[in-house]
Swiss-Prot record:
SUPFAM superfamilies: Pentapeptide repeat-like. The keyword ATP-binding does not apply. When present on multicopy plasmids confers increased resistance to fluoroquinolone antibiotics such as ciprofloxacin and sparfloxacin but not the quinolone nalidixic acid. Forms a structure that exhibits size, shape and electrostatic similarity to B-form DNA; it may bind to DNA gyrase which is postulated to protect it from fluoroquinolones. Keywords: Antibiotic resistance. This is Pentapeptide repeat protein MfpA. Belongs to the pentapeptide repeat protein family.
């Protein structure tokens, strides 16, 4: 761990934490580089204005945590659970959320382009106007997820996505339009 010259920036690099209880700690403006957190509890933690590069948050708990104004670049949030968190605005660049639980989270207008969200629970999540270009949502649970006016172009999804998520006004590509039609029982024929 290094403390910045002005005393307000803490940098953690190449460290590992397993089962660590960070509950209610102030980790705002922290910077992590290649740090691995396994089964850590971040409940009530303030991670606002933090930066994370190549770090992994594996099976961690985020309950009533604050991560707004933070940046996650090439991070793994595999199996982590987010409940009642203040998330947006936030930046995620090529992050892996496989098996994470984001059900009920407010992700309006968040850019999740190129992120992996395989088998993620987005049940009841609010992703209105979110950008999910080229994201991988295969196997994700999206019952009652709000994706109205979201940008879904190039996103990989299962057929059930089109019948369970609310997608009115979403931007989709031609291939997705055909998948949407097929999922709703329409027979699409050329000419």
């Amino acid at each position: 761990m290094r403390i910045g010259a002005n005393g307000d920036e803490t940098v953690w690099a190449d460290e590992e934490f397993a089962g660590r209880d960070f509950r209610d700690e102030d980790l705002s403006r922290i910077r992590t580089e290649r740090v691995v957190f396994t089964e850590c509890d971040f409940s009530g933690v303030d991670l606002s204005e933090s930066e994370h590069h190549g770090s992994a948050f594996r099976n961690c708990t985020f309950r009533r945590s604050t991560i707004w104004h933070s940046t996650f670049t090439n991070c793994s949030l595999l199996g982590s659970v987010f409940t009642e968190c203040r998330i947006r605005p936030v930046t995620f660049v090529e992050c892996d959320f496989t098996l994470a639980v984001l059900g009920g989270c407010d992700l309006r207008a968040v850019d999740l382009s190129d992120c992996r969200l395989r088998e993620v629970s987005l049940v009841g999540a609010d992703l209105r106007k979110a950008v999910l270009r080229r994201a991988d949502l295969t196997g994700s649970r999206v019952q009652d997820a709000r994706l109205e006016e979201a940008d879904l172009r190039g996103t990989r999804v299962d057929p059930t996505f089109w019948t369970t998520a609310k997608v009115r006004g979403a931007k989709i590509d031609i291939e997705q339009a055909l998948a949407y039609a097929a999922a709703h029982g329409l027979a699409v024929h050329g000419g």
